From Swiss-Prot:
It comes from Beauveria bassiana (White muscardine disease fungus). Pathway: Secondary metabolite biosynthesis. Heme binds at residue 456. Belongs to the cytochrome P450 family. The lineage of its organism: Eukaryota, Fungi, Dikarya, Ascomycota, Pezizomycotina. This is Cytochrome P450 monooxygenase tenA. InterPro entries: Cyt_P450, Cyt_P450_E_CYP52_ascomycetes, Cyt_P450_E_CYP52_fungi, Cyt_P450_sf.
């Protein structure tokens, strides 16, 4: 009978077997726990109409094209616009049940109420998307591994560290000397990235990269941008990685590792020598106070330490510089907002710039919040269900009934759409209005840094650094003008970065 399995019939046999496995998996997932969910009032959620409802590769390919074509934000908005009668719906995403939502209560459940039922390891660590860049770290681990990663970095994100403006000042002073003459058009985004690379390298490694003086030292920044851009693409298309050429991404990973390895190896060697001298009763120099040194004392394994450092240094180096660029993008297009910021800065006078002062500047903080709202660095909040759980909303035709979520399902809250929901923000939800934050209270409808125990540990540090830079720029320049007629188009990295840069001109 073996001759029957010829070159024509064999592919069909394989296809049939794969189809049977997928259908069996979906049947078992649907059948499991049905009576329990009915007892809790759960109803099935609306489902996205797909041309490929069995395998679910259509939406994966569509998303991959959007990412590579720099239309990801538009793709997300169009996806939700296609389901106008509900804030929550599901799709078959490469064989997984993927639940999309813009419901704040679902974000609350994932981050707080049902935190123990959700995690990130199944989507960030087990698929090969992020490897060989990094494996375990604070943003890829759950349970004890996550607790350990958090312990590694927590001392450096305490209040005594993030409130310091003295740490920022010398780098901001240098940055100001590099800005061009009045009226000259320039792209401020690369300069912001060099500025932040210098701050971050001193904070993490104890020694600044000094890329504002030596521009060639910023090359690792562009490699990190490629690592983040490719990492997102690989994580979201991990089931069809074979369909794309990733040579450019592996080259970027190699460059980043090549940058970090000397720091890590020299630190481990210095630590070993110090411990030996202490053991021998010999005098030692004063202990280093940078983050890498602190991490190395708790994790002296080179490969594991590099993974942890990668997942702090690379995303952290991108986030703040992009965010300040977004702030300036909007301010250059809203002269009244710049004037109001200038008025608030002028009212302070010559008082020293402190964390408390910046936190109390209402309009400045309105600018930060409004920028987070319109261009959130964290576009989606994605979690995998680690166990069966019932969410308070999302079921039924309008999404108002409880929703049964099974182990292995993916829940994705689309913040870039939720933050523009007219039901929450009013008819001007798409408009830039920093004043809307005057008197507005926070809540689960707006969490730029996440919430609950897993919120971003660098939240206050990012806010302080961003506010400080905007304060200094408003203090120096009377006018900011947009010199790029292009609308904002996002190139996705850790978050959306302006594809056309941030081309502006300043006037004193």
């Amino acid at each position: 009978m073996l001759p029957l399995l010829d070159s024509v019939s064999l592919p069909y046999l394989i296809l049939s077997a794969c189809l049977s496995v997928i259908l069996l998996r979906r049947f078992l997932a649907h059948d499991k726990g049905g009576s329990k969910s009915i007892a809790q009032g759960c109803l099935p959620e609306p489902r996205l109409r797909q041309w490929d409802p069995i395998f679910g590769f259509g939406i994966v390919i569509s998303q991959a094209r959007a990412l590579r074509g720099h239309r990801y934000l538009e793709w997300l908005r169009d996806l939700h616009a296609s389901m106008p009668h509900t804030k929550t719906f599901s799709a078959n995403y490469g064989g997984y049940r993927w639940i999309f939502s813009i419901e704040p209560e679902i974000l609350k459940a994932v981050y707080a109420t049902n935190l123990q039922n959700f995690g990130v390891e199944p989507i960030r660590q087990h698929p090969p998307g992020f490897q060989p860049f990094a494996h375990k770290g604070v943003s890829t681990s759950d349970g004890d591994d996550w607790s350990f990663s958090r312990t590694l970095i927590k001392p450096f994100f305490e209040r005594s560290v993030y409130i310091s403006t003295d740490r920022i000042k010398p780098f901001a002073d240098k940055f100001m000397t590099l800005l061009p003459d009045d009226g000259e058009t320039f792209d401020i985004q690369p300069l912001l990235q060099r500025w932040f690379l210098d701050i971050t390298s001193e904070f993490i490694f104890g020694k600044s990269q000094d890329s504002m003086t030596h521009a060639d030292r910023a090359e690792v920044t562009w490699a990190m941008a490629d690592v983040l851009r490719g990492g997102r693409q690989r994580a979201q298309t991990h089931r069809i990685l074979w369909a794309f050429n990733w040579d450019w991404w592996f080259e970027a990973v190699e460059k980043v590792h090549g940058f970090l390895n000397p720091y890590i190896r020299s630190t481990l060697k210095e630590l070993e020598e110090r411990q030996q001298r202490i053991k021998d009763g010999l005098p030692v120099d004063e202990e280093r106070t940078d983050l890498l040194w602190s991490m190395a004392t708790m994790l002296p394994d080179e490969e594991e330490l590099r993974s942890q450092v990668c997942l702090i240094f690379v995303p952290n180096n991108d986030t703040t510089s992009m965010f300040i660029g977004h702030c300036l993008y909007f301010l250059a297009r809203n002269s009244n907002a710049w004037k109001r910021l200038r008025d608030e800065v002028d009212a302070v006078g010559d008082a020293p710039i402190t964390f408390e002062m910046l936190r109390n500047m209402k309009y400045l903080n309105g600018i930060l919040n409004e920028t987070h709202r319109l261009i959130p660095n964290n576009v989606t909040q994605v979690r995998a269900a680690l166990s069966d759980v019932v969410l308070p909303l999302g079921g039924g035709p309008n999404g108002k009934a409880p929703l049964d979520v099974r182990k292995g399902d993916i829940v994705s809250v689309t913040k870039t759409v939720m933050y523009r929901d007219p039901e929450q923000w009013g008819p001007d939800a798409n408009e830039y209005r920093p004043e809307r934050w005057d008197g507005m209270r926070g809540g689960w409808h707006f969490l730029p840094y996440g919430g609950g125990p897993r919120r971003c540990p660098a939240q206050m540090m990012v806010q302080n650094e961003s506010a400080y830079m905007l304060f200094r720029l408003a203090q120096k320049y009377s006018t900011i003008v947009a010199r790029d007629p292009e609308p904002f188009r996002a190139r996705m990295r850790i978050g959306p970065s302006s594809m056309h840069g941030v081309k502006i001109a300043f006037y004193k």
